[in-house]
Curated annotation (Swiss-Prot):
Domain of life from the UniProt record: Eukaryota
Cellular component terms per the entry's GO annotation: extracellular space
Family: Belongs to the insulin family.
GO biological process assignments: cellular response to oxygen-containing compound; glucose homeostasis; glucose metabolic process; positive regulation of protein secretion
TM regions (residue ranges): none
Cross-referenced PROSITE patterns: INSULIN
InterPro entries: Insulin, Insulin-like, Insulin-like_sf, Insulin_CS, Insulin_family
PANTHER family attached to this UniProt entry: INSULIN, INSULIN/INSULIN GROWTH FACTOR
SUPFAM superfamilies noted in UniProt: Insulin-like
Organism expressing this protein natively: Capra hircus
Gene name for this UniProt entry: INS
SMART domains: IlGF (SM00078)
Protein name: Insulin
Length: 51
């Protein structure tokens, strides 16, 4: 997994992959869209959004 742009459904799919059964907490206020779609994010950064 390399740092990459993740937007829309790709971002959601990546969160499901990373978080698995834990699920994830998604809110635009958290900045995940700015971080991962406008910029790039890593696997480690995605894990911050897991429950």
């Amino acid at each position: 997994f390399v740092n990459q742009h993740l937007c829309g459904s790709h971002l959601v799919e990546a969160l499901y992959l990373v978080c698995g059964e834990r699920g994830f907490f998604y809110t635009p206020k958290a900045g995940i869209v700015e971080q991962c779609c406008a910029g790039v994010c890593s696997l480690y950064q995605l894990e911050n959004y897991c429950n």
